Amino acid sequence: MEQEIISAVQDIIDFINTRGPTKVFVIDSHFKNNRSITPVWTKNDLSLVAFIKKFPEYFIIGTDLIVSHKNIPIDFQTIIQSWNLVEDDFALTEKIVGKKLTMFEFPNNLDIIVTSDFQIVDNWIENNIYDLKQEIIGLDTETLISGKSEKISIIQLSTSKHNIIIQVNQMNTLPQNLNKVFFDESIIKVGVAIDIDAKKLLQYFPTINQIKKTLDLSDLFKQTNFTKHISINPKESIGLKILAAHVLDLYIENKGDSEIKKSNWNNPVLTSDQVKYAITDSYLSLMIYNELQLMTNNLDVKNLLKNFCHIDESSVKKNSKNNLTRRELEQKEQERRLKSIESKIKKWLKEDDSLTFEFESMNAFYRRHVHTFVEKIPELSSETKGTDPNKYVIITRHC
């Protein structure tokens, strides 16, 4: 088996060196048509993507599942060591949902507009939402990660055929039709953890009166028959990756750990990778909603819809000890924990000779802060381990 694995890696490298960077399905088809109907990855119950991802020292898989080869010499021992590592996230996700998955490939023909122009936004909403009488839209946001609370950078909206990325970071008010959509009770806004997006929009854009009729897909999923066959904590939110796997049979790479997630969303010109990353959530959210409705024969969602409005801070009861509002207390607790994370890293670096430091399980916000902080220290690297909801970060010291 080991020789077969080494040969497969070498053959894939030779194929890429001959053709240049190549899509996964082309490589897979070539080997199955010209070498063996059951190549080594199939024998081991892996997709070619999962197989290639076991060897990150030799291969890079791009956004469009295009595989390129790192120009470094082959080392047989390294290949076998990589092969014997714990199974990758793709295989783990398949185990979690109990079925085979297909790697999500971003559609090349998807209609996407990126703009900060008020008139373009208003026209797009009029033409693609109101004129077409859209009753459901996908909604998501992205924000620059800096270790502190930041204003939303972009808002993503998706309909069945069209998508828009609205660059709002430099806006103090929002386009008229965008406010109209948020307030419109006839349009359901679907997303994952959409309450977080709604609250942050209200926090930074006071011209938004209310955001009405939002639907968290995690709540909808819990109302279906899916949950009879899987273990779900009713108090826990289900992420997009697991929802897409259960409902669409698609595997989405760990977006929370992506370098694109950490990129500058306030740039006036977004890269193509940023555009694809950003629109994936709103686009797939709408797909998941539509598929769930087909599977459940139009499940009634009225009791799951939520409205969000501005809270008048002057009317919020103050904490008697510190004279702080609830929001201010939450902010202070967040800042306290961020400082605690940094302090633990510094203390370990200064007082401990061990090569690794393992944090307890934490949510994506705090994991991102660990990664961002570690990037500033040349001799350290960090990696997220585990599966939701028990993901944690390991920091490694490089001597």
Curated annotation (Swiss-Prot):
PANTHER family: 3-5 EXONUCLEASE, EXONUCLEASE 3'-5' DOMAIN-CONTAINING PROTEIN 2. Residues 335-399 form the R3H domain. It comes from the Viruses. Its EC number is 3.1.11.-. GO terms for molecular function: 3'-5' exonuclease activity; nucleic acid binding. InterPro entries: 3'-5'_exonuclease_dom, 3-5_Exonuclease_domain, R3H_dom, R3H_dom_sf, RNaseH-like_sf, RNaseH_sf. Residues 118-297 form the 3'-5' exonuclease domain. It holds the Pfam family R3H. It comes from Acanthamoeba polyphaga mimivirus (APMV). PROSITE patterns: R3H. This is Putative 3'-5' exonuclease R431.
